[in-house]
Amino acid sequence: MPSFDTPEPISVTAHVEAGSIQFTAGDGPATVVDVRPRDPKRDQDVRTAGQTGVTYAGGTLTVRTPKLGLLGRTGTVDVTVGLPVGSHAEVTGAWLQVFGEGRLGEVRVKTSSGDVRLDTTGPLKLTASHGSITVDRVEGAAEIATSSGSVRVGLVDGPAVLKNSHGTTSVEEARGDLRVSGANGDILIARAEGSVTATAANGTLRVAEVSRGTVQLETSYGAIEVGVREGTAAWLDVSSDSGQVRNTLSASKAPEESADTVKIRARTRFGNIDVRRARP
């Protein structure tokens, strides 16, 4: 079990062809790496674990499983990395699950298949072809994309771009401008402090609370629902080709210059549109 003295945050570059990698960020003065075969009785897993390289130099930890054999076979390993809070991580893999506990710094992940679950990160760039993605908190900008699977983000404290071809996408709170796009799947945003652009070919679009900026929502098949924060004036441009448009906001005079305003543009071909005050 390799261990390195690391009193300050470090950078990690890891490539795991198949298996999992878990980062645990803590206050300890050392970085500890453990590589284990997924199945201790499977020779390929044991061989891959034994051939996985772990090195540390110049503030960078490198973890790399061996290249695929001539027959394209590889073993499955589980890697754990205990490291200082605020450390950066760049992870790639084919069939790989990625987990993060504690507060990491900037994180970049690219996998072909596998779930990703992270507690807190700095700026985040995450790409997965297949797999569910869960991130509790992003302290900075976020770029997340998956071809198939759910995407759930707690708080994003910066601008964010989320792309999900097939699956539900949900955001609890976005403090910067937010762009979400999908082909098939609902888009659910609980609270947006900035502008929002959300588009889907087939899915419901719901933004529970907006307070300022521009909100642009468009879906071909699905309902649209927008909640406007109390005290915020709203300019509306909404239409449905086949469905009802319901606006329960009370008409008012032009807002004062100091008042928060939001411009809402919503379009759906098949589905209802509801605009109301946000529920407390």
What are these regions (language model features)?
Residues 1-280:
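Intrinsically disordered, low-complexity terminal regions
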